[in-house]
Structures are given as structure tokens and as C-alpha cells.
Amino acid sequence: ALALVHHLAISSNVPLPMIASTFAAMSPHAVVEFVPKEDAMVRKLLSSRRDVFPDYTIEGFREAFGERYQIVSETPITASTRTLFHLRRRD
């Protein structure tokens, strides 16, 4: 789910736990890109609205997705603020 989570969370106000539950219902494995608020794209999304997303942090992502998935790996993307997560659903 590359370039998807920040759009669902910031643009559509979908809470991270709901995103994690939806992904877990669809697939036992996931590769998810976390894009932090410091990223230019998220700053652009937030420029036209009030930031009402206190849980939209990498820690909040780990917590929300960690309830449904085991974090297999977490890889910072070089020359970027973004991080790729390889996830395996908890059964």
C-alpha cells in the first residue's frame, strides 16, 4: 500500500486502526509506506486544513498496525522521510 495510508488518514479522516483492520481483512501480508507529517506531500495535504491528527505519527502507525500485524521489517527510504513496513498478519 504505497502512497495510500497518508491519503486515507489525512484526506479522508480514516483512523490508522481502521486502516490496519481493513488491510488485515484483505491480506495476510502487506508492504506499507508510512509518510510522516514532515513529508512535503503530507504538508501539502495539511496546508488547507487544521491538523486534527495527533495519532498520525510513526509511533501511532506502529501501534495501530501492530495490533493486527507483526512488523517483519521497517526500512527507512534513503534521502526521504518515508519508511517502508513489511507486515505479516497476526492470526
Q: Model-found features: residue ranges?
A:
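A short pocket-lining beta-strand/turn micro-motif at the edge of beta-sheets
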Residues: M26-A30, Q70, T83
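Core SAM-dependent methyltransferase catalytic element
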Residues: V72-D91
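Short alpha-helix
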Residues: D51-V72
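A short beta-strand submotif of the Rossmann-like class I SAM-dependent methyltransferase core
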Residues: A1-V5
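Conserved beta-strand signature within the Rossmann-like core of class I S-adenosyl-L-methionine
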Residues: I19-M41
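Short secondary-structure boundary/capping segments
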Residues: V14, L45-D51
